[in-house]
């Protein structure tokens, strides 16, 4: 090449240049039968191509590879230049075109597109055969759902003409008057169609579809400064008008608190976005990760018009989007790493909501299918719908809504264990028992539990997340112990093991709880069965037939202290048999029950309100007043919503309660019956510190529900005492662990066996229904020693 020959500096090409070239050659590219789509991006270099050692070798390598370039065998390198990407069904070398070749020369895709003013735009040909997508008829959750708050990543369900359609709630937006969940239009239906979602307890009705929806817009209307004469920007975005905004958080489940909008427009949109990492949470797939592979992907042409998606996103291995993830928001990972060798954990990453996933493109290569996500700019969506991104709705709620209490009590208890070998063993396996306290206190929390599904669940939540489930069906779990399904969730023998309504008045004692503490003969199965029969007879005499039936129902007769007795016996047996996996599994699950015992509402007939009196509440959906029990809804508001919302303030208070010397400071026990009595003792202490009716009164006086004002009011009234009862729970749990360890002669177990355990070995234990079996009160006696 001489100085007089034309030389093109492709690196100077802009997004505008690339779009202009594609627009100019619109019909030319459209005529290529082998071309299935085009986009703009950076030139893809085959991964085994030698890196250039001299100037110019990047574009013209001395030993250029000629085999088919695909999305999986090529990559963007730091010297990749701007180009138009042309995706073709099949690959053919140049000698296959022409008189002696198999193909018409007119069908060859040009290497360069030349504009009238002399600019030249390179074309990168990529083999990426389109394939049909996988679909699923009904929604199936990817893992454990939130117990309480809905937010980004929650499922959106609509039923139209006998069919069910699912999508994902991407984020919250507001028009200044109302707040909406943004999702895919196809899961909204016509205006005012009722929309549903799911929490752990089952299906919930959340609102109605808005008439404000998007389908497609002319490219020139969305991007007036960019060329695109015969193109549509494809959009599939709808809004759900929420019945109760306080049921929602602006955060995405399992991700850090939502960051500022990743604002994209003609003036700042550049190819620097190529290969940038993004992540999101789909209602079907759970956590997904990917990289931006191309911009303005033309995936279809109809009647001479192109249909274009703003972003083509390549999935990370094993983390692709699926049917039901439409509406999900992709977050740009804009984190600045302080140490590249130790990247920041997910809760501390800087994520910017960037794009709404509305569709997918499945490419097939050598029989392997890869689902790429097609997404549109969230800033464009907000502009076209005339709404703004909401970032401050219940910001403190993110990650594990409803788990904070159980996990934190287990984490605090480990440090209180006196036996050095046991404490070290539990510390080494804290990730199996629970999470470390700093992780639990993070507003974003980590992603682990939210992605679990039928994989490993930290033990402190196994009784809720595994055993209180069916072992089959849409919300089933392997290892589930429930036996019947109903309109409000499933039921089974595990459920009554989590509480004991023993503050009913009986005999000379003020409560049956007091009777158990005063006389050990009341700590028997027969005495408890008689107590429930007495309560049933009393309810019937008072005209409360529902109450009478409830007290006689075996699945409603709480037996929490006997469940702790059963676990003490099991842990002792595991230690005696030197079965460290069995002991660890039982110890972690037992943390859940001792956590329940430390919550006053788990030991009270007022567990979710006082049925003897009513209050008038305004129904958010019907707009009408309704009569409900006094304190109705208090259980989840106090134990789930308030504790999760105030975790960052609560944990320092608990640490202060536990700051003195002496570990748990409780005597070690040597029998299951003594441990059951200690559990009743704990329930009595916490009821004295935080009387159940006081919780109900605070809830009603603060306005009821789970609005921020309600949670703030309850925290002001109850915060200090909540820390005190949770600290007591940690002390009694540490005492339970250490008592079983010492009584079973844990000192006989070689220290070399007290190592890090495999979570899958632990899971293999707890999915067995015979592992510390869940039994009703009338059946548990045979298990107790």
UniProtKB/Swiss-Prot annotation:
- Which terms under GO biological process does the entry name? defense response to virus; proteolysis
Q: Where is this region: Disordered?
A: 470-503, 608-629
User: What is the top-level taxon of the source organism?
Assistant: Bacteria
One example of the protein's molecular function in GO is: hydrolase activity, acting on ester bonds
Biased composition (Basic and acidic residues) is annotated at: 470-481, 491-501
Segments spanning the bilayer are none
* SUPFAM superfamilies on file: Phospholipase C/P1 nuclease, Trypsin-like serine proteases
Q: What class of enzyme is it?
A: hydrolase
Q: Any keyword Cytoplasm?
A: no
The UniProt keyword set, sorted, is:
Antiviral defense, Hydrolase, Protease, Serine protease
Tell me which EC number(s) this protein carries.
3.4.21.-
The entry assigns this protein to a family as follows: Belongs to the peptidase S1 family.
What this chain does, per the entry, is described as: Probably a dedicated protease for substrate gasdermin bGSDM; cleaves the bGSDM precursor, releasing the pore-forming moiety, which integrates into the membrane and triggers cell death. Involved in defense against bacteriophages. Expression of gasdermin bGSDM and this neighboring protease is toxic in E.coli on solid medium.
* Protein name (Swiss-Prot/TrEMBL): Probable serine protease Ga0098714_109514
Organism of origin is Bradyrhizobium tropiciagri
């Amino acid at each position: 090449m001489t100085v007089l020959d034309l030389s093109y500096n492709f690196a100077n090409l802009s997004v505008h240049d690339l779009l202009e070239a594609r627009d100019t050659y619109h019909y030319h590219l459209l005529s290529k039968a082998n071309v299935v789509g085009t986009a703009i991006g950076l030139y893809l270099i085959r991964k085994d191509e030698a890196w250039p050692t001299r100037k110019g070798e990047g574009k013209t390598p001395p030993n250029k590879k000629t085999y088919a370039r695909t999305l999986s065998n090529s990559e963007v390198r730091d010297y990749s230049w701007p180009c138009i990407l042309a995706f073709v069904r099949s690959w053919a070398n140049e000698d296959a075109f022409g008189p002696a070749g198999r193909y018409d020369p007119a069908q060859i895709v040009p290497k360069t597109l030349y504009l009238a003013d002399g600019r030249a735009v390179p074309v990168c040909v990529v083999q990426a055969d389109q394939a049909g997508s996988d679909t699923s008829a009904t929604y199936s959750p990817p893992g454990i759902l939130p117990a309480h708050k809905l937010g980004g990543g929650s499922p959106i369900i609509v039923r139209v003409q006998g069919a069910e359609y699912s999508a994902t709630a991407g984020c919250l937006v507001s028009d200044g008057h109302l707040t909406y969940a943004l999702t895919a239009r196809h899961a909204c239906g016509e205006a005012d169609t009722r929309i549903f979602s799911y929490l752990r307890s089952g299906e919930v009705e959340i609102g109605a579809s808005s008439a404000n929806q998007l389908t497609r817009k002319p490219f020139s209307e969305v991007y007036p400064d960019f060329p695109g004469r015969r193109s549509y920007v494809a959009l599939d975005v709808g809004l759900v008008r929420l019945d109760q905004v306080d049921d929602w958080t602006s955060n995405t489940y399992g991700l850090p608190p939502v960051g500022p909008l990743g604002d994209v427009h003609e003036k700042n949109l550049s190819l620097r976005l190529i290969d940038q990492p993004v992540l999101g949470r789909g209602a079907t797939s759970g956590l997904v990760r990917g990289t931006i592979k191309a911009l303005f992907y033309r995936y279809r042409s109809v009647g001479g018009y192109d249909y274009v998606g703003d972003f083509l996103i390549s999935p990370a291995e094993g983390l692709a989007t699926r049917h039901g993830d439409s509406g999900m928001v992709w977050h740009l990972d804009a984190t600045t790493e302080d140490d590249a060798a130790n990247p920041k954990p997910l809760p501390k990453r800087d994520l910017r909501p960037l794009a709404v996933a509305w569709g997918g493109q499945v490419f097939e290569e050598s029989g392997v299918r890869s689902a790429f996500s097609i997404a549109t700019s969230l800033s464009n969506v907000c502009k076209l719908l005339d709404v703004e991104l909401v970032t401050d709705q219940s910001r403190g709620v993110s990650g594990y809504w409803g788990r904070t209490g159980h996990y934190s009590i287990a984490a605090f208890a480990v440090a209180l264990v006196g036996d050095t070998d046991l404490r070290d063993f539990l510390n080494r396996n804290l990730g199996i028992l629970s999470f470390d306290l700093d992780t639990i206190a993070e507003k974003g929390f980590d992603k682990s539990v939210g992605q679990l599904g039928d994989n490993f669940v930290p033990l402190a939540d196994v009784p809720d997340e595994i055993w209180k489930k069916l072992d089959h069906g849409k919300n089933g779990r392997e290892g589930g112990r429930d036996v019947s399904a109903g309109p409000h969730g499933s039921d089974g023998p595990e459920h009554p093991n989590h509480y004991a309504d023993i503050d009913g008045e009986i005999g000379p004692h003020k409560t049956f709880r007091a009777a158990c503490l005063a006389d050990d003969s009341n700590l028997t199965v027969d005495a408890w069965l008689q107590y429930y029969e007495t309560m049933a007879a009393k309810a019937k005499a008072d005209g409360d037939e529902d109450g009478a039936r409830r007290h006689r129902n075996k699945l409603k007769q709480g037996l929490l202290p006997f469940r702790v007795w059963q676990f003490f016996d099991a842990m002792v047996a595991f230690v005696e048999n030197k079965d460290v996996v069995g002991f660890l599994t039982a110890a972690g699950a037992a943390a859940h029950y001792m956590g329940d015992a430390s919550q006053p509402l788990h030991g009270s007939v007022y567990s979710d309100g006082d049925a003897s009196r009513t209050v008038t509440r305004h129904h958010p959906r019907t707009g009408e007043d309704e009569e409900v029990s006094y304190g109705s809804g208090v259980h989840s508001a106090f134990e789930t919503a308030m504790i999760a919302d105030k975790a960052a303030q609560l944990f320092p208070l608990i640490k202060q309660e536990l700051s003195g010397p002496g570990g748990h400071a409780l005597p070690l026990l040597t029998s299951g019956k003594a441990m059951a009595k200690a559990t009743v003792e704990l329930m009595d202490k916490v009821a004295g510190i935080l009387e159940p009716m006081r919780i109900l009164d605070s809830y009603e006086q603060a306005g009821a529900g789970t609005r921020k004002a309600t949670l703030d009011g309850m925290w002001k009234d109850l915060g200090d005492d909540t820390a005190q009862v949770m600290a007591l729970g940690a002390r009694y749990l540490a005492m339970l662990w250490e008592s079983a360890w010492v009584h079973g002669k844990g000192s006989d177990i070689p220290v070399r066996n007290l190592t890090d355990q495999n979570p899958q070995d632990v899971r293999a234990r707890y999915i067995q229904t015979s592992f510390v079996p869940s039994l009703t009160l009338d059946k548990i006696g045979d298990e107790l020693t």
